[in-house]
Amino acid sequence: MTGSRATTCLMAQRRTDRLALCVAPAMTRTSNHHAVIIGASVAGLFTARVLADHFTIVTVLDRDDLPEGGTARKGAPQGRHAHALLAAGQRTLMELFPGIADELLADGATLINFNEGRWYQAGGYRSKINKKRAAISASRPLLEHHLRRRVAALPNVQIRSSVAVDGLLYDGRRVRGVQVCEDGTLSGITGDLVVDCSGRSSRASAWMEQIGYPTPKVDHVKCEQVYSTRIFRRSPSDMDATFAITIESPADGKRAAFVVPIEGDRWIVTLGDRFTAPITDEATFQAFALGLPAPEAGHVVTRAEALTPVMNHRMTSSQRRRYEKLRRVPAGFVTLGDAICSFNPIYGQGMSSSALQAVALGRAVARHGIADTELPKGFYRQAAKVIDSPWKIAVGADFAYPETTGPKPIGTNLVNRYMARVLMATRVSPEINATMLEVQQLTSPPSVLFRPSFIVAVRKAARQAERQMSDEPAAPLVPAAAA
């Protein structure tokens, strides 16, 4: 499926999602207002697009020498690994950038359907669902390339690379811009709103302390996630699925695998583990894939031509800066994306959360006005609501592993026991699997999983799944003639 047919499919899916995307109406730009965004990341680019509707001028500053095409940025080494926009993020992408789905597909991205993939979890494969769920699959660098191109084409947006932000300009009442270093020279850039989208390593707390404001409490959940990736040439004979996900049950191990198609007729294969060293050599990469409880990753890495060496990355903890709990925050300055909350990447929530936070910022600007000193507090309250659901999902799942440490939500052990039953039920119930998928894709809140009628259905389906469990081998993914 390509071209306008793909857009029609994705738009139809978007209309059926339960939660409507509310993009704030654009304000009339009657004054010469300037927004300065730190970081041309996914978060920064979504933010630039949203604020372009509210500000006369939007300037995006990035310390990297930004690439022209779809290659990974130096400042985003995680971009070499498998990424996904969840349904909520994809919906936001299409609302803010009409036609970008066709542009991505024309540049080699793949349209995949959930029912054409294989998702192994809780000791078995999750069932097919009763409605089509399409998604665009591409590398993160390709997505960033198209976002940069679309944002740079906006008449009131400028993206400047190789510009490092060293601090805030503050007049005693509000932030008035940023201090930058460009070509070895320090200078200032004034603005009515500064948005820090510089990522997990954000220096916003230090900057706030320098101008006399308290710094946010930081929640660290130590998950010690490591992941290793190789890219392979893609052939239809590799497996009879458009993508594959394998996640071991916590009782059995900590391993996971993601096999997804990307542009250039390639597979990106990312293997994840916890509380261990990342894979660095080809033999260990192959042995890991072959040792998983489902065969898809092993089939691809042994049958397909490898195009890259093993690339690895480590993330020691998820972290959430609690700006919404501060009584005093500087006017004219907010943080967004990983600068607020950096999730365990294994759940794929980061880019989608950033997109939704950008929309929340647009709503806050429309409600409060650019000059309102209450704008930052209003935004942080809305951002916290965006972050709460994926944070609960990720942190709850992380605490299924006894080595995880950090602030543990009350009732986590009980919830995790119930979630194990939900995942068991997804093996036999398309309805339960569809609801679980909506929660994981951030289009429904986790609370839907705890409705009395749903709990009853889970109890029944989980018992059915247990009765059906057997030692039968998984169906072969590669025709015998291709073996």
Predicted features, each with a name:
Residues Q121-R140, L271-R274:
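Helix-loop-beta segment of a Rossmann-like dinucleotide-binding subdomain
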Residues H33-V60:
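N-terminal Rossmann-like FAD-binding beta1-loop-alpha1 element of flavoenzymes
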Residues A84-L85, N130-R149, R203, I279-T280:
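Short beta-strand to alpha-helix junction loop
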Residues T8-A35, D53-F55, L66:
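Extreme N-terminal leader/targeting segments of oxidoreductases
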